[in-house]
């Protein structure tokens, strides 16, 4: 088993599920109201998307009711968390995690969290795939960043809300900063985890 890959897949799925819980909560607060379009802001009034760095947590939903959307999103978010942490390493576990994340994307679970979950699901399909690469200098270097790259990624996902509350105007003026940091840390986490698995496979074969 690719242990680092399993941890990354589970972590990404956890992030997607947690994002679903958060978005669903704010959608429920908007009550039994109909969205104006398929694209919604999870956070209702007094939040104004044009005045806050997180755009009031944008999402999309195919369900024409905020209350129903929020309830279903929270339920699916909880299921996603449980599946990611307990079952992603099992047969078809990665594919199911990706499917749950697609569901979150379609019913109000946000935009970025479900995409992270889908990536986690795709990684999950490789957990039990035999390793073919042999360690090289590049993979050994990347392996040294495990698990700290993943820790940094997870810390930033939560820290961005604190940073946003303190430097709202700065983040609004530099809107690409947060997605670039998230994407960069996510890619480094995946590569570091793969490097670690390559090294562990070599030790197991020795």
Residue map of PLM features:
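Loop-to-transmembrane alpha-helix initiation sites
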Residues: 109-119, 174-180
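Transmembrane alpha-helical segments in integral membrane proteins
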Residues: 8-11, 15, 68-90, 187-204
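Juxtamembrane "helix-exit" motif on the non-cytosolic side of transmembrane helices
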Residues: 158-171
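Membrane-interfacial, low-structure loops and terminal tails that flank and connect transmembrane helices
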Residues: 127-145, 206
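Alpha-helical transmembrane segments and their helix-start/interface "positive-inside/aromatic belt" motifs
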Residues: 2-21, 143-147
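Perimembrane loop-to-helix junctions flanking transmembrane segments
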Residues: 35-58
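Alpha-helical transmembrane segments of polytopic membrane proteins
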Residues: 66-70, 173-186
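Helical transmembrane-bundle signal
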Residues: 13-27, 73-83, 97, 101-104, ...
């Amino acid at each position: 088993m690719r242990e680092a890959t399993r941890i990354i897949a589970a972590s990404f799925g956890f992030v997607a599920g947690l994002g679903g819980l958060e978005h669903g909560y704010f959608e429920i607060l908007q009550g039994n109201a109909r969205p104006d379009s398929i694209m919604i802001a999870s956070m209702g009034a007094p939040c104004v998307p044009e005045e806050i760095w997180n755009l009031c947590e944008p999402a999309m939903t195919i369900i024409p009711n905020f209350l129903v959307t929020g309830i279903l999103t929270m339920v699916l978010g909880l299921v996603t968390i449980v599946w990611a942490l307990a079952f992603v390493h099992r047969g078809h576990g990665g594919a199911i995690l990706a499917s749950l994340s697609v569901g979150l994307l379609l019913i109000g679970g946000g935009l970025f969290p479900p995409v992270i979950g889908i990536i986690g699901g795709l990684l999950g399909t490789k957990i039990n795939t035999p390793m073919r690469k042999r360690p090289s200098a590049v993979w050994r270097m990347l392996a040294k960043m495990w698990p700290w790259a993943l820790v940094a990624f997870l810390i930033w996902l939560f820290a961005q809300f604190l940073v946003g509350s303190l430097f709202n105007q700065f983040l609004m003026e530099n809107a690409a900063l947060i997605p670039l940091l998230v994407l960069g840390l996510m890619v480094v986490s995946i590569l570091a985890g793969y490097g670690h698995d390559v090294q562990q496979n070599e030790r197991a074969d020795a």
